[in-house]
């Protein structure tokens, strides 16, 4: 479970850096791809949290005990989430720019935010699965 929490903390930073440093600076989505926006939104919301497919974390966001403890990882995640929320509160035009995603579609910044939150939901489900396992030590 500690590795999942660390992965979430690293991922939150990675998503925000991608959105602010790349997506918001990318060109607009090409004409003709606008009709795909709703389909992509729905795809992200339906598929990213789905735990029936398993994936290995890419190397840059793989857990490596960067924070020293699960508590420190959680603290970092919460601080990163606050930065994400602050960015969203002050930023307009999330649909105005699009960048290639891991799914081979271009995601606009709004869709990257959907991806970030759906990714958190996926791993929250994973944590709950671990906690529900009879072998999980509650001590």
Describe each model-derived feature in a short phrase.
Residues 1-43, 89, 93-139:
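Short, contiguous alpha-helical
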